[in-house]
């Protein structure tokens, strides 16, 4: 049985946090990393690793979203949208050629602190495959050619409930004083901030850049918003997204760390279940809703909250969570 809903206040907090960004398990055995090539100096591999790990920390985050150029005569670009928050980024695991970083929002509302598990980014060195978005409700494991994976890292972004969002492959570069990773063009579903408006576009084709900077890092997105409803995708409008992570000690990270300590076992089991589905089906089918994202999002987040509140045991939460994913991913 799925756990009953949280009080309306907590549900609103979950949905608000999920809408902040164009967001945020290990990859299955089918997506194994290859060991560092003998042709790549060990120091280069380690330099990449340290650049990835440098994204962990405690931050104030600023989100800037701006539609710039319309390619549809009937579409006017939206006004700039600004938001922000406090977010910690913690290392879930570091296995050398596989690194996982979990983002957790720590929000203050008057006297109350609300913690929400946010997106997650997984990095794999020289991946054999990557999880990619195929269209409404569907993701698949896409092979990566030997040429494309040589010296490269995949980054897979997972949503708040550890369901997939998008994945891409790229290389870290260190030119012009910048430590920067740049992805290949990647398809992704609409962020909730767009989906709730029922816009003419229904997907993004984006290029991601993760760039280290003094006192933090920045996530740059160059998104072409596309409509695929009439067949082949057609460009509607180009958007820039700038998510800036600035190191901060102006708030206590403890509520976020307490949440993660209480729920990380549950989320490890949830990641394993998503892995199981990926391996079983060669991808993931899961329905999406405009306001809440994948249909698994709200019930899984509520289960984690009930676990932290002591209203359900970890074993029971895991059993219910696995059942939620199983039902949602069966056509």
What is each PLM-predicted segment?
Residues 11-21:
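N-terminal export leaders
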Residues 19-30:
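Hydrophobic h-region of N-terminal signal peptides that target proteins for export
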Residues 28-54, 66-80, 95-102, 107-110, ...:
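Amphipathic/hydrophobic helical signal segments and adjacent flexible N-terminal regions
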Residues 56-64:
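A short, Trp-centered hydrophobic/proline-enriched beta-strand micro-motif
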Residues 77-79, 83-93, 102-104, 120-121, ...:
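Hydrophobic/aromatic beta-strand elements that line small-molecule binding cavities or substrate pockets
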Residues 105-171:
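Extracellular-facing segments of soluble proteins and assemblies that are Gly/Ser/Thr-biased and enriched
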């Amino acid at each position: 049985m799925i756990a009953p809903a949280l009080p309306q206040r907590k549900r609103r907090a979950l949905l608000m946090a999920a809408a902040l960004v164009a967001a945020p398990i290990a990859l299955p055995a089918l997506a194994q990393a290859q060991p560092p090539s003998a042709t790549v100096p060990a120091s280069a591999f380690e330099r990449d690793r340290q650049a990835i790990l440098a994204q962990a920390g405690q931050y104030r985050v600023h989100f800037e979203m701006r539609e710039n150029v319309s390619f549809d005569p009937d579409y006017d670009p939206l006004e700039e949208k600004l938001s922000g928050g406090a977010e910690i980024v913690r290392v879930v695991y570091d296995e050398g050629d596989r690194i996982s970083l979990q983002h957790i929002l720590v929000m203050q509302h008057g006297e109350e602190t609300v913690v929400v598990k946010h997106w997650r980014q997984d990095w794999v060195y020289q991946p054999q495959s990557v999880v990619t978005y195929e269209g409404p409700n569907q993701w698949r494991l896409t092979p990566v050619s030997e040429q494309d994976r040589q010296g490269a890292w995949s980054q897979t972004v997972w949503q708040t409930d550890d369901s997939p969002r998008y994945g891409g492959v790229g290389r870290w570069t260190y030119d012009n004083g910048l430590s920067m990773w740049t992805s290949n063009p990647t398809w992704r579903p609409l962020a909730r901030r767009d989906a709730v408006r029922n816009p003419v576009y229904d997907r993004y084709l984006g290029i991601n850049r993760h760039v280290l900077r003094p006192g933090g890092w920045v996530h740059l997105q160059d998104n072409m918003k596309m409509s695929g409803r009439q067949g082949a995708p057609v460009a509607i409008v180009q958007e820039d997204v700038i998510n800036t992570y600035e190191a901060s000690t102006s708030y206590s990270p403890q509520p976020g760390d307490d949440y993660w300590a209480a729920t990380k076992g549950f989320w490890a089991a949830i990641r394993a279940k998503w892995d199981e589905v990926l391996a079983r089906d060669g991808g993931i089918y899961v329905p999406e809703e405009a306001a809440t994202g994948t249909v698994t999002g709200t019930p899984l987040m509520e289960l984690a909250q009930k676990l932290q509140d002591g209203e359900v045991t970890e074993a029971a939460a895991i059993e219910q969570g696995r059942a939620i994913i199983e039902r949602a991913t069966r056509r």
